Amino acid sequence: MDQSSSGGSMGGRLPFNQSFWEEFLMGREGHLPALPEISHVSKSVVRILGGNPGSMHLQGTNTYLVGTGRSRILIDTAQGLPVWISRISSFLYTQKIELSYVLLTHWHGDHTGGVPDLISQNSSLSNRIYKNRPDSGQNPITHGQIFSVAGATVRAILTPGHSVDHMCFLLEEENALFTGDNVLGHGFSVAQDLGRYMDSLRDMASLGCRIGYPAHGAVIEKLPGKLEEYIQHREGRERMMLSALTRQRVQGEGVREGGVKCGLTLNEIVMVIYGRLPQEVIEKALAPSLLQVLWKLTEDRMVGFKPGDPLKRQWFALEQKKRNKVRGCPS
């Protein structure tokens, strides 16, 4: 949907506040299963941890060597810490492995940070780096593009949402999917664009892959179930918010000044769904994700809003007959 027609812009979508979540996520980190620094997760996939465990990275960024011969594919390069380049360089040397392709799932620094170290170790890799929407000197990846080495045929799958450039990679020999940050081994991921993210989750599910190799966390042994869990989780939140706004409209409690019929502010929606919470929790923790849901419902023509500050504007459920009209506060 054109942003100008919504009465707002992407600037109205509050950013995820990482620092606010640090204490909570650190507690979650303590309950994660330990993962080996280097492990053969299948006969053709070796996982090498990035050495960057933490609140936002779980046990660290997973990087993967794919293939069975001397020539391999590397998926992601972690954050750029010395421990990772030491681990992978040692493994490549002792196993007499060469890299034919370096595939990046997306632009975030905990996936691309190791690229300079790889190139400094082996300058010939400078023309073997592939990414959707590539940086200068990198090669583009297109949807459906095939990368092949002995024992591995890897197909690129465009899956935006977590980031605009996000790609997954399907390992055809195993019917397995490298899920990047779209689906994690533990917990749930975050999305930059919820609508596109939901479409990508459904696209991933339609592939029918049985195993997931996530960019963070343990191997996903039952990927179809995990994808369904992710989809149901997001759809459930949409239903809760739409239900709250629909009740407000049906009960006629949203009549404001001059008889103009509007809905609920974000704070009021939170009160209906979660009860009374500290304002700091609403603004820093809940607001970014809940506003994403409201924007998606707006783009789906289920919800409208009165323009204004994202935390103070009023959101309302659209009546069925108005869902095909331009959104704005109904009169």
Curated annotation (Swiss-Prot):
<dbReference type="InterPro" id="IPR001018">
    <property type="entry name" value="Beta-lactamase_class-B_CS"/>
</dbReference>
<comment type="similarity">
    <text>Belongs to the metallo-beta-lactamase superfamily.</text>
</comment>
<feature type="binding site">
    <location>
        <position position="106"/>
    </location>
    <ligand>
        <name>Zn(2+) 1</name>
    </ligand>
</feature>
<keyword id="KW-0479">Metal-binding</keyword>
<dbReference type="GO" id="GO:0017001">
    <property type="term" value="P:antibiotic catabolic process"/>
</dbReference>
<dbReference type="GO" id="GO:0044550">
    <property type="term" value="P:secondary metabolite biosynthetic process"/>
</dbReference>
<keyword id="KW-0862">Zinc</keyword>
<feature type="binding site">
    <location>
        <position position="110"/>
    </location>
    <ligand>
        <name>Zn(2+) 2</name>
    </ligand>
</feature>
<dbReference type="InterPro" id="IPR050662">
    <property type="entry name" value="Sec-metab_biosynth-thioest"/>
</dbReference>
<protein>
    <recommendedName>
        <fullName>Lactamase-like protein nscB</fullName>
        <ecNumber>3.1.-.-</ecNumber>
    </recommendedName>
</protein>
<dbReference type="GO" id="GO:0008800">
    <property type="term" value="F:beta-lactamase activity"/>
</dbReference>
<dbReference type="GO" id="GO:0008270">
    <property type="term" value="F:zinc ion binding"/>
</dbReference>
<comment type="function">
    <text>Lactamase-like protein; part of the gene cluster that mediates the biosynthesis of neosartoricin B, a prenylated anthracenone that probably exhibits T-cell antiproliferative activity, suggestive of a physiological role as an immunosuppressive agent. The non-reducing polyketide synthase nscA probably synthesizes and cyclizes the decaketide backbone. The hydrolase nscB then mediates the product release through hydrolysis followed by spontaneous decarboxylation. The prenyltransferase nscD catalyzes the addition of the dimethylallyl group to the aromatic C5.</text>
</comment>
<comment type="pathway">
    <text>Secondary metabolite biosynthesis.</text>
</comment>
<dbReference type="Pfam" id="PF00753">
    <property type="entry name" value="Lactamase_B"/>
</dbReference>
<feature type="active site" description="Proton donor/acceptor">
    <location>
        <position position="110"/>
    </location>
</feature>
<dbReference type="InterPro" id="IPR036388">
    <property type="entry name" value="WH-like_DNA-bd_sf"/>
</dbReference>
<dbReference type="InterPro" id="IPR001279">
    <property type="entry name" value="Metallo-B-lactamas"/>
</dbReference>
<keyword id="KW-0378">Hydrolase</keyword>
<feature type="binding site">
    <location>
        <position position="108"/>
    </location>
    <ligand>
        <name>Zn(2+) 1</name>
    </ligand>
</feature>
<feature type="binding site">
    <location>
        <position position="111"/>
    </location>
    <ligand>
        <name>Zn(2+) 2</name>
    </ligand>
</feature>
<dbReference type="InterPro" id="IPR036866">
    <property type="entry name" value="RibonucZ/Hydroxyglut_hydro"/>
</dbReference>
<dbReference type="InterPro" id="IPR047921">
    <property type="entry name" value="LACTB2-like_MBL-fold"/>
</dbReference>
